[in-house]
Amino acid sequence: MSESLIAIVPAAGIGARASLPGEAAVPKQYRPLAGQPMLRHAVRALLADPRIVQVRVAVSAGDGWVEQALAGLPRTVWRPCGGPNRVDTVAAALADSGADADDWILVHDAARPGLPAAALARLIDACLDDAVGGLLALPVADTVKAGRQRVSRTVDRDGLWLAQTPQMFRAGLLRDALARARAAGLAVTDEASAVEAAGHAPRLVAGALRNFKVTWPDDFELMEKWL
């Protein structure tokens, strides 16, 4: 039985934290980096591995930027199935994909344009024979503090990881986990959280520093240096 690898990129958000006061309301994923929209870099990073048969980009209805941003890219489609939050968008994109239960789904953030080919290959290689699937992640290196305006405590960083994307799971398992999370009203911020809540333990695969999420205005300058 042939199992396809399909990538999903949720790109229906606006990325308000990445904008400076007074900047035009261009969604973060379409802002330029190294002369191209950030979303295009993220999709091209996925296309670098020929095992991924298709990249499916989930956008908001009426999105006026995606066609130009992704023009000419092979194995790439975009669909207006963006929802009010990430879990809804990914669930809709997964349903729209028509993936079989045993197909592999890789969900990748549009705001991670610096994904190295080696890290992507490492994730795929590690997960293809895994019963659950997994995600790219980095061990926490800094001292971690908890608190608001003042420190309330120092958190033991031993065993703590910073989750990255892609996150790779079989379509059937991911579909079930997302449905459970939505039904329970869980505030999951990534697919691994939904899979964990469904009783599974995703595999941790070494990520990469340059695969950070572009979140704040200064992040654009830093990512430019990588690209």
Swiss-Prot record:
Domain of life, per lineage: Bacteria
Pfam families: IspD
UniProt-listed Enzyme Commission number(s): 2.7.7.60
GO molecular function list: 2-C-methyl-D-erythritol 4-phosphate cytidylyltransferase activity
Keyword annotations: Isoprene biosynthesis, Nucleotidyltransferase, Transferase
Site (Transition state stabilizer): R17, K28
Biological pathway: Isoprenoid biosynthesis; isopentenyl diphosphate biosynthesis via DXP pathway; isopentenyl diphosphate from 1-deoxy-D-xylulose 5-phosphate: step 2/6
GO biological process: isopentenyl diphosphate biosynthetic process, methylerythritol 4-phosphate pathway
EC top class, as a word: transferase
Site features described as Positions MEP for the nucleophilic attack, chain residue numbers: R157, K213
PANTHER family in the record: 2-C-METHYL-D-ERYTHRITOL 4-PHOSPHATE CYTIDYLYLTRANSFERASE, CHLOROPLASTIC
Function: Catalyzes the formation of 4-diphosphocytidyl-2-C-methyl-D-erythritol from CTP and 2-C-methyl-D-erythritol 4-phosphate (MEP).
Name of the protein this chain belongs to: 2-C-methyl-D-erythritol 4-phosphate cytidylyltransferase
Natural source organism: Bordetella parapertussis (strain 12822 / ATCC BAA-587 / NCTC 13253)
